[in-house]
């Protein structure tokens, strides 16, 4: 795969993380650049690892994985999205404290859910002449950039939305999950 195809793939794969990080940035109400960069790093690392895992799986059992990856991604994103919506509706101070304490693991779970399509791409890459390490690094770097940018965009949207920002973030995650499911079921091109 040539450089331009790799970059197109990398930035295409980063769009789910970009959308999810906009919602996350909006729900945090003025996240600092350090928080945005941390989010970008988490999303980028996970998004770089999953195509390598998919590539390894593709060498052995692609038909079994491809049947279920979209259901797993949809389920994770739906559950995380519903949790954000419920927390946005409740919006009690003690729950905000709890969310901040567990923020790292919620970010990791969201990153995993949005990167399952990268794992599926990795399965497909196992059948092509590609350097999987270079491709995975490109995907990870593009995702880090886009997720960091998404958080900063969310920073400006959050104050406008107020308490509804977390609800919007949950709706975005559910929307990403539904999109992944519909694409894999053949309803979207």
Curated annotation (Swiss-Prot):
The UniProt record lists the keyword Cell inner membrane: yes
Origin superkingdom: Bacteria
Cited InterPro entries: Mntp/YtaF, Put_MntP
Mode of membrane association: Multi-pass membrane protein
Main location: membrane
Subcellular location: Cell inner membrane
This protein's GO CC annotations: plasma membrane
Record function comment: Probably functions as a manganese efflux pump.
Xref: PANTHER family: MANGANESE EFFLUX PUMP MNTP-RELATED
UniProt similarity note: Belongs to the MntP (TC 9.B.29) family.
Protein name per its UniProtKB record: Putative manganese efflux pump MntP
Source organism (scientific name): Serratia proteamaculans (strain 568)
Gene name in the database record: mntP
